[in-house]
Amino acid sequence: MSVTDLMANRYSERRFSPTPVEDEKLQAILAAGALAPTADNKQPQRILVVRGDEALAKMDKCTRCRFGAPVVLVLAYDMTVAARHPDVTDFGTVDIAIVGDHMSLAAEELGVHSCWVGLIDPPELRRQFGIPQTYKIVAVMPLGYPSERSRPSRLHRMRQGVQKTVFFDSYATGEDSGALDA
């Protein structure tokens, strides 16, 4: 399957099966994240794998959006490691987003579904999992196999065309915008 097909087929899973994700697949997903480019190649990502019953019960105190997944990745970055620039203060958030996207696509290729979840309680995550203060927690990513009731949201295929989201040479509006006619 092409990367474009993976992107088109992947959807945010909100109905997971309790079936465990095999260690080999989990390792492949994590390895894909390690391939992600990061600003100045600093690699500030710090991924916590949450999968034991007690740890998942702790996760349920930190988000209501685990959706029954047997694995949850905490996506964070070390603020002392992330690249810095005077005009751009948060390269780490972009870095961890790219890492998360790489892992999400690798999971999809392996038949493992995922969901990017930003509805989290970072202070509670810190308390429950001993996350250092120097780590900025950006999101969690539940991983697992889809349940029999799994379906993409009705909004999944509703995408604005590039003619509405891509501009050439300026962000001017109207007929002179230079937007694609796709």
Task: Indicate residue ranges for each PLM-predicted region.
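Acidic, surface-exposed loops and disordered segments
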Residues: 1-182
